[in-house]
């Protein structure tokens, strides 16, 4: 197996294969890097996922079924501390990734599933939707302020109102585009329909959850909770340090936000979520604690339905 450590940046891929450092442009298609890979026998690529900058490399691994090891970005700084060097450069990071691949990568490497939605990601559409939504909310706040000022002309109010209507149209456009991507695969479309059967979960939350579940298809319940940042953290040391337990918040922030908002409806109409929410409130827990627990419960229910392929029912909730 030919191990290649790749440090990904916005413009370059810095690689190290145990013999030589090479630099390739991080351009659409990764043509130069692809030609280099073609000359390798049984390549294995070790890299850190860096959001949008590593998407092209991930897509290449999918298309060519190249084994890859996606290393948590928190690992490399620790490798640097225990190594000989302390400096951080793209070259040193590529070499650290290579050495990790030689020592442990073969047992951790996997082939990314060929995802028909990878080239035009659902996540990308959701990101565009969030940008438009923030702009729309900002304009609505401005309109509210201007409407209270008698000096504001009706022409300006009409212009801001028209801008809000246009942003709402763009929001719908992004969500419709995401749904069209989902409809490409009948199985994925069916799973989205299953998520929409859950009381409290609307189209945007369902699409957000679907993207998470698709990305981590092999994750179990505890892992998906951690990936959303709902896993608990305890702070305790000896007899003197006893901090309050809290959620880690190390996972997907957008998933947490969507689920937290969904609890407003789920706490009223979803029996299992309502029962948990009311029990915590009756026990004197703060509103934020009760809603966070309800959001975690909603995530677990949604994941159980996604994995089972069965529509929502009270039985699903009992098992979750």
Protein language model regions, located:
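Gly/Thr-rich phosphate-binding beta-strand-loop-beta motif of the actin/hexokinase/Hsp70
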Residues: 1-18, 97, 208
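Nucleic-acid-processing active sites and adjacent nucleic-acid-binding tracks
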Residues: 18-44
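Short, solvent-exposed helix-loop connector elements
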Residues: 37, 110-124, 152, 243-246, ...
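Short glycine-rich phosphate-binding loop at a beta-alpha junction
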Residues: 42-53
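Long, charge-rich intrinsically disordered scaffolds of nucleic-acid metabolism proteins
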Residues: 70-194
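Phosphate-backbone recognition surface of nucleic-acid-processing proteins
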Residues: 203, 209-283, 287, 319-320
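Basic, amphipathic alpha-helical segments enriched in Lys/Arg and hydrophobic/aromatic residues
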Residues: 283-320
């Amino acid at each position: 197996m030919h191990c290649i450590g790749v440090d990904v940046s916005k413009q370059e891929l810095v690689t190290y294969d145990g013999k030589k450092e090479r630099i390739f442009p991080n351009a659409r298609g990764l043509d130069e890097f692809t030609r280099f890979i073609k000359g390798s026998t049984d390549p294995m690529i070790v890299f850190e996922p860096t959001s949008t900058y590593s998407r092209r490399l991930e897509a290449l691994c999918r298309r060519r079924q190249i084994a890859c090891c996606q290393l948590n970005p928190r690992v490399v700084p620790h490798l640097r501390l225990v190594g000989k060097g302390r400096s951080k450069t793209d070259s040193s990071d590529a070499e650290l990734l290579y050495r990790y691949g030689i020592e442990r990568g073969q047992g951790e490497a996997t082939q990314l599933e060929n995802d028909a939605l990878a080239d035009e990601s659902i996540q990308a559409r959701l990101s565009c939707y969030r940008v438009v939504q923030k702009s729309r909310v900002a304009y609505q706040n401005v309109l509210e302020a201007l409407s209270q000022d008698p000096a504001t002309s009706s022409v300006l109010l009409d212009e801001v109102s028209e801008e809000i209507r246009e942003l709402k149209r763009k929001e719908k456009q992004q969500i419709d585009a995401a749904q069209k991507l989902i409809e490409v695969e009948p199985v994925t479309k069916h799973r989205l329909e299953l998520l929409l059967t859950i009381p409290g979960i609307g189209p945007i939350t369902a699409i957000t959850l679907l993207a998470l579940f698709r990305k981590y298809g092999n994750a179990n319940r505890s892992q998906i909770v951690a990936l959303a940042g709902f896993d608990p953290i305890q702070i305790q040391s000896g007899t003197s340090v006893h901090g309050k337990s809290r959620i880690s918040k190390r996972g997907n922030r957008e998933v947490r936000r969507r689920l937290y908002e969904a609890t407003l409806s789920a706490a009223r109409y979803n029996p299992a979520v309502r029962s948990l929410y009311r029990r915590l409130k009756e026990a004197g827990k703060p509103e934020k604690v009760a809603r966070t627990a309800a959001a975690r419960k909603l995530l677990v229910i949604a994941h159980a339905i996604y994995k089972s392929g069965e529509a929502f029912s009270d039985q699903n909730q009992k098992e979750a």
